[in-house]
């Protein structure tokens, strides 16, 4: 479904949790979906990605530094929140992008990326200020100044 809808403009780079990396099968869509699950440095994948689609992984905290769009594929949010682990933040109110519950919603958000960016711009800024603002390349300088003050 995604290849048919997005394949002319996008490719998908997949980086799963290492526990399930071997289970990912991209047979039949190798020219559209690339399994990078065993690629060591996820930050390099962030740099070449236009959009981050994640679930409950902490990767969005790091990806947010790039100020690029994010989608949160949360098809099982009720179970994850209420039964499995819970969350550190209020996902519905604080995430810097939409929660989507189906592949169709993922596709729709990607097709309407400009509208999504506008809708979540303010929330993204609040999130960035809260979680990313001191990650500005000057952390060592601040640490030295604090220690040798």
Model-derived features with residue positions:
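Catalytic donor nucleotide-activated moiety binding site of glycosyltransferases and closely related
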Residues: 1-36
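Catalytic binding pocket for nucleotide-activated donors in carbohydrate/polymer assembly enzymes
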Residues: 25-31, 58-131
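C-terminal alpha-helical cap of glycosyltransferases
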Residues: 136-149
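Short beta-strand/turn micro-motifs composed of small residues
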Residues: 14-16, 54, 74
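Short amphipathic alpha-helical segments and helix-helix/interface helices
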Residues: 1-3, 60, 144
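Acidic, amphipathic alpha-helical patches
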Residues: 42
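Acidic donor-binding loop of glycosyltransferase active sites
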Residues: 47-58
């Amino acid at each position: 479904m995604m290849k048919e809808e997005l394949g002319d403009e996008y490719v998908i780079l997949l980086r799963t949790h290492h526990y399930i990396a071997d289970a990912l099968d991209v047979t039949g869509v190798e020219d559209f979906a690339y399994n990078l699950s065993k690629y060591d440095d996820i930050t390099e994948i962030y740099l070449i990605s236009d959009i981050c689609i994640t679930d409950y992984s902490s990767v969005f905290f790091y990806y947010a530094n790039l100020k690029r769009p994010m989608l949160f594929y949360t098809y099982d949010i009720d179970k994850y929140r209420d039964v499995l682990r819970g969350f550190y933040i209020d996902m519905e109110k604080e995430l810097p992008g939409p929660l989507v519950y189906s592949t169709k919603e993922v596709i729709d958000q990607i097709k309407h990326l400009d509208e999504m960016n506008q809708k979540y711009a303010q929330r993204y800024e609040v999130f960035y200020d809260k979680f990313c603002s001191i990650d500005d390349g000057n952390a060592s300088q601040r640490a030295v100044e604090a220690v040798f003050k």
